[in-house]
């Protein structure tokens, strides 16, 4: 049990800025892929699975966008075309808007 200590930097969780630094440095791409029967899937790539909890981010996005989705490798797939709304939500979560394409 860590007792509130960040495993990356060793600081208490209240003082840890590891996740904020990781959010600022990542280059994220948001693309639309077509699947079978003409279904569209929004794919978010460029996220580092070691610095950011992809499951937690995926859960947040699925709840805000009211859609289904999954985490595959180091990308998040959301059902439907949500490109612009995903960019806004990522910026709201603290990601640098200039690094989202």
From Swiss-Prot:
Gene3D superfamilies: SUI1-like domain
Keywords, alphabetical: Protein biosynthesis, Translation regulation
Transmembrane feature ranges: none
A Gene Ontology BP annotation from the UniProt entry: translation reinitiation
Top-level taxonomic group: Archaea
GO molecular function list: mRNA binding; translation initiation factor activity
Pfam family, one: SUI1
PROSITE patterns attached to this UniProt entry: SUI1 (PS50296)
Family membership: Belongs to the SUI1 family.
Protein name: Protein translation factor SUI1 homolog
Source organism of the structure: Methanoculleus marisnigri (strain ATCC 35101 / DSM 1498 / JR1)
Classification of source organism: Archaea, Methanobacteriati, Methanobacteriota, Stenosarchaea group, Methanomicrobia
């Amino acid at each position: 049990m860590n007792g509130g200590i960040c495993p990356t930097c060793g600081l208490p969780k209240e003082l840890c800025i590891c996740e904020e630094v990781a959010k600022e440095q990542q280059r994220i791409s948001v693309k639309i892929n077509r699947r079978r029967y003409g279904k569209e899937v929004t794919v978010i790539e460029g996220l580092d699975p070691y610095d950011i909890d992809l499951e937690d981010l995926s859960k947040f996005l699925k709840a805000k966008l009211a859609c289904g989705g999954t985490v595959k490798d180091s990308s998040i797939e959301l059902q439907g075309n949500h490109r612009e709304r995903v960019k806004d939500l990522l910026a709201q979560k603290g990601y640098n808007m200039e690094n989202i394409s």
